[in-house]
Amino acid sequence: EGGSSGEASGMWFGPRL
């Protein structure tokens, strides 16, 4: 979990790739 909301299920790939 690196971003805030995330794309898939709130994993590492979110707003801040």
Swiss-Prot record:
Keywords: Amidation, Neuropeptide, Secreted. One of its GO terms (biological process) is neuropeptide signaling pathway. The modification Leucine amide is found at L17. Signal peptide: none annotated. Its main location: secreted. GO terms for cellular component: extracellular region. GO terms for molecular function: neuropeptide hormone activity. It is found in: Secreted. Myoactive. Belongs to the pyrokinin family. This is Pyrokinin-5. It comes from Symploce pallens (Smooth cockroach).
